[in-house]
Amino acid sequence: MKKKALRKDFYMEIRKSMGRFLSIFFIVAIGCAFFAGIRSSEPDMRYSGDAYFDRKNLMDLQVISTMGLTDEDVEAIEKLDGIEKAEAGYSVDALCTEGDNQIVMHVMSLLPSMNQVQVENGRLPEKSDECVVDADFLSKSTLKIGDRVTLSSGTDKPVTDSLKEDTFTIVGSVSSPCYIGFQRGSTTIGSGNISAFLCVPEESFCMEVYTEIYAQVKGAEKLTAFTDQYDQRIDSVMKEVEAIKEEREKARYDEIVTEASEKLADAEKAVSYTHLRAHETDSYL
């Protein structure tokens, strides 16, 4: 009897304040729908991002060395059990004038198959003095396809120590799987912040050694990026790479010392020969 009276009173209260009841009902319904949408969008975003990374053959690991990297380093990494494939590339940060501003661009070489860029407008570079530029940057910049950009090193060394040319023609705009956010990284030149990336053919660089090696991990493509399973797989292979770190560092150090010693020996021979010629000339006179 009490329950029946309570129920009757409950319905009467709703009828008396139907507007307030409906307001609360719809607020709760919208909140539940919004929460359900947020919960379902997170895995959808993961799967979409992972599918995009797989299509563009995005690397799983990046190896960088201050002493530079060689073909022997690439081979050593490819021989590891957990590595599917490795490719080496070049990169350098350079200053570029855009309107009245001087900005920093991250110049990198296009790889044979990994980290494939998506052409948004124009085409990919076909010559060593052609380039493609960050699409997000180009859409807001005074620069456009067909313009020529001149780069400088921002240091006391010329940019031509790294690049064969210092001026490039923009032939397209691209997006890269390496940059999925708005930030482009930091640098030691200019303002300290990189404004955009610029891609050129590998032959545009004149460096003797690579600046980085990109590697793909066996089995990683079947896993969803940014998940615990993916991170654990990458971490396990990272330990394999770190295990050969000292060996490869020593090999590279010895190579640098040997090259320097050979150059020193050649210079000493040249000096000795010059002294000998000078002595012979004095004797003749």
Task: Annotate each language-model stretch with its function.
Residues M1-A36:
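N-terminal Sec/SRP start-transfer signal
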Residues P43-S283:
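Basic-flanked hydrophobic alpha-helices used for secretion and membrane insertion
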